[in-house]
């Protein structure tokens, strides 16, 4: 709820609108409320809360070739998102089409029934590129969502369901995929950003662009295209840019007063799809292959979130939007507990997350980051 205050002249004014931003969300394990409960207090406290829904929630469809397919999650698990306080989700990513058009249709239908706004996927490319618009305190926020990493089979077309996308140039000319050598934004991607953000600005006072981007399971490092495409979104008129996909957090930068969260990491990911004991051949092979490709060994205690050990350092992005349009960015530190439940971090654990974020921001080649503790968040200085 937007809060109202009285200034020293006796004039009623609104306090800043608080925007909470979460990374990848995968809820394909029962008792979704439990897995979200550790971060729910921060989500519920926000005026607007946005996450990234990684997989389709459906009992229908067949596997779509093009990437290692994620299983469809139970549609009823989305109800926990609403109960936890999420107002909107981005959908454009490498797994949203893993159960074909039926998976996208069922996911959107459930979100609509719950009153959760969404952007980034749809029955056609036009629908996938359409922004979600949220109204809060007399002001409007538009959310746009794009997949930067493929697979191309998941991209929506004029007559095929899928996700919105930003085309990248690959260094060897290969099709865009999560394992392709992605190099730079294609001219077409820049045109899409300019067109869509310009249109969104006519509908809303603030525009958030969500980019599914980055190198998975790799601490700190930004791929060559990540800063250019994030900055292109800002230049096209976006106010906030958020990234996800890597399943580990990335650095933060402020560009002309506008925050870029290059990787929010895992908002809440609990899945058995990455268990060595599961019986899906392609997923079982990926469980081992990713360890060789990215040089890590998951902590065996994290049976439902077997990611890079550094992924236990997590965060929620938080932005305060004042009456004059100014933005104050920060993070809510999060720690992931075994077997994969994220919880709000406090005390020394929060301090470790703070130090980690400052360190990986520098290691990623971004300007130095200083996070200053405050009661409601770590403020980006």
Predicted regions and their residues:
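Acidic, metal/ion-coordinating pockets
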Residues: 1-381
């Amino acid at each position: 709820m937007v809060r109202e205050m009285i200034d020293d002249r006796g004039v009623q004014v609104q306090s800043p609108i608080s925007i909470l931003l979460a990374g990848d969300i995968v809820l394909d394990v029962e008792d979704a409320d439990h897995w979200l409960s550790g971060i729910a207090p921060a989500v519920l406290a926000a005026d607007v809360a946005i996450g990234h829904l990684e997989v389709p929630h459906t009992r229908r469809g067949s596997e779509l070739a093009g990437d290692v397919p994620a299983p469809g999650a139970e549609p009823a698990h989305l109800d926990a998102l609403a109960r936890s306080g999420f107002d909107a989700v981005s959908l454009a990513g490498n797994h949203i089409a893993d159960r074909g058009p039926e998976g996208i249709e069922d996911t959107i239908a459930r979100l609509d029934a719950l009153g959760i706004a969404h952007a980034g996927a749809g029955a056609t490319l036009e629908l996938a590129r359409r922004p979600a618009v949220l109204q809060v305190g007399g002001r409007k926020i538009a959310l746009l969502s794009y997949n930067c990493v493929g697979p191309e089979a998941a991209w929506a077309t004029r007559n095929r369901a899928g996700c919105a996308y930003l085309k990248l140039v690959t260094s060897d000319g290969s099709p865009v995929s999560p394992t392709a050598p992605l190099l730079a934004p294609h001219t077409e991607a820049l045109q899409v950003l300019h067109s869509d953000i310009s249109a969104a600005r006519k509908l809303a006072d603030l525009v958030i662009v969500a980019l599914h981007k980055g190198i998975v399971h790799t601490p700190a490092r930004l791929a060559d295209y990540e800063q250019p495409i994030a900055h292109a979104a800002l230049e096209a008129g976006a106010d906030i840019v958020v990234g996800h996909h890597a399943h580990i957090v990335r650095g933060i930068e402020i560009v002309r007063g506008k925050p870029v969260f290059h990787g929010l990491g895992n908002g809440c990911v609990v899945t058995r799809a990455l268990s060595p004991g599961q019986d899906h051949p392609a997923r079982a092979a990926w469980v081992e292959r990713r360890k060789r490709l990215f040089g890590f060994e998951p902590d065996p205690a994290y049976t439902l979130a077997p990611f890079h050990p550094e992924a236990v350092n997590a965060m929620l992005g938080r932005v305060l939007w004042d009456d004059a349009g100014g933005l104050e960015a920060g993070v809510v530190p999060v720690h992931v507990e075994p077997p994969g439940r994220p919880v709000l971090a406090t005390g020394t654990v929060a301090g470790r997350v703070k130090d980690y974020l400052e360190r990986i921001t520098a290691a990623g080649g971004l300007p130095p980051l200083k996070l200053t503790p405050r009661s409601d968040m770590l403020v980006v200085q």
